Design a protein with these regions (language model features):
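Short coil/turn motifs at secondary-structure junctions
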Residues: 15, 136-138
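Histidine-centered divalent-metal-coordination microenvironment in nucleic-acid enzymes
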Residues: 118-136
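Hydrophobic, small-residue-rich alpha-helical packing segments that form membrane-like cores
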Residues: 136, 162, 166-174, 180
Length: 211
């Protein structure tokens, strides 16, 4: 039997000028998180530092076994470990419901939208939907794992990806371009839609980083 889980990062879109004058997406994300923990009592906030970027009360464990927290200004949700894909989808939908309920409680459901997101249109960064595969350290990663996983990770964009409207106009290979942050998302007849959201951002077949 295998366990599975999912991690989702939510972008905050403020569609109302009235709300935008009072809140930024970052502060609104914190407001929603605090409302869920304090008013709706969905779980227990962390009492201690978990990391340099995760101070006390930045987030916490939910009573359903998952976690909800603020990561670099946006709401992030991690499901509990699940034994079936049906349960996994149910827990992911539960996160959507929690955010909608908070917006409803705060009276801003028609003014604010939380969307599952893995592209930052301001900085050009890509993130989210991390996956973990438990294997022995004795397994040669580059010789076994990469050849086995790479075709799956690439082709699943076709049948399981959400796609993307438009394209990103930053050259990831151009250091001067990146420093200038010449970032824009455009929709044109030339590139109206892409199958994969991250195609404009990924420049390496694999990247290894230990935190």
């Amino acid at each position: 039997m295998r366990i599975c889980g999912i991690e989702t990062e939510y972008g905050c879109l403020i569609e109302s000028e009235r709300v935008a004058r009072e809140f930024s997406p970052d502060t609104l994300s914190i407001l929603v998180k605090d409302h869920l923990f304090y008013a709706n009592d969905i779980g227990l906030l962390d009492a201690q530092y978990r990391d340099r970027g995760e101070p006390p009360r930045n987030g916490g464990f939910l009573y359903n076994g998952g976690r909800l927290y603020i990561d670099m200004g946006h709401v992030e949700y991690a499901s509990p470990e699940c034994l079936s894909l049906r349960d996994l989808i149910a827990y992911e939908k539960a996160a959507d419901f929690l955010l909608l309920q908070a917006l409803e409680d705060l009276g801003i459901r028609d003014d604010v939208t939380f969307v599952r997101n893995n592209i930052d249109h301001v900085t050009g960064a890509t993130f989210g939907y991390h996956e973990n595969y438990l294997v022995s350290r004795d397994v040669p990663f580059e010789y076994y794992m990469v050849p086995a996983l790479m075709p799956f990770l690439v082709t699943r964009q076709i049948y399981a990806g959400a796609g993307r409207v438009g394209f990103h106009e930053e050259d990831p290979y151009d250091e001067d371009d990146r420093r200038r942050r010449r970032v824009a998302t455009r929709v044109t007849d030339e590139v109206p839609y892409q199958i994969a959201q991250r195609s404009d951002h990924i420049v390496a077949d694999q990247y290894e980083w230990v935190q």
